[in-house]
């Protein structure tokens, strides 16, 4: 089976990849871009560390303009994030039967309602996976730290390649840093995955060999 994961290069979507590995033969990491920045390269770097194929998808014309319009009208990022997120999920659902992302239990945006999820799955005959939906931030950080090295950075430094970072970049280019400061929280952070901890895999391999040795002796 194949699953497409909406991938930012941060710890959340990277943890999703690790959780899905036992269940899928092929995992494709897909990063959506608004086409005017190179933040997607952060996700490409993280994908190489996870050793899964990566692809960049650019939103169709008009999505960025609508998202920026929402940002400027509401003065808050949530509605714009909730506008672009379902578009990304539905775009991938037309190509892949299984689509996953790193939305968490306590996320306000982006986040799809249960009714929207059921409608999407019924309409496109697909499966939408949210492996982190029952987990809080502290739990996710602890689990991700077990298998990943990552750093936390202010979102204004464009550390990852998610919808918020892309909208920050586009808003600054179109309307200046003042509008970014007005709409987005100044202290918001994102994570960037640096590497996958290979020693964990090596230790597990040694443990498996030890268990096999014990079984053969018994």
Question: Where are the predicted features?
Answer:
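Nucleotide-activated chemistry modules centered on ATP-dependent adenylation/adenylyltransferase
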Residues: 1-5, 9-218
């Amino acid at each position: 089976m194949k699953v497409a994961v909406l991938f930012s290069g941060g710890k959340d979507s990277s943890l999703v990849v690790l959780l899905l590995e036992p269940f899928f033969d092929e995992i494709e990491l897909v990063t959506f871009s608004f086409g005017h920045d190179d933040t997607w390269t952060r996700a490409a770097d993280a994908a190489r560390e996870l050793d899964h194929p990566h692809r960049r998808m650019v939103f169709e014309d008009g999505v960025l303009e609508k998202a920026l319009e929402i940002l400027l009208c509401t003065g808050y990022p949530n509605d714009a994030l909730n506008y672009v997120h379902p578009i990304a999920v539905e775009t991938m659902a037309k190509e892949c039967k299984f689509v996953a992302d790193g939305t968490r239990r306590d996320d306000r945006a982006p986040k799809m309602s249960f009714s929207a999820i059921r409608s999407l799955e019924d309409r496109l005959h697909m499966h939408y996976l949210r492996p982190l939906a029952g987990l809080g931030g502290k739990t996710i950080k602890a689990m991700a730290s077990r298998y990943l090295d990552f750093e936390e950075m202010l979102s204004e430094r464009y550390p990852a390649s998610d919808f918020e970072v892309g909208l920050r970049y586009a808003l600054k280019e179109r309307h200046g840093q003042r509008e970014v400061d007005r709409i987005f929280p100044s202290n918001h952070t994102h994570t960037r995955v640096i590497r996958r901890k290979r020693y964990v895999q090596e230790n597990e391999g040694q443990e498996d060999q030890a268990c096999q040795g014990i079984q053969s002796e018994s």
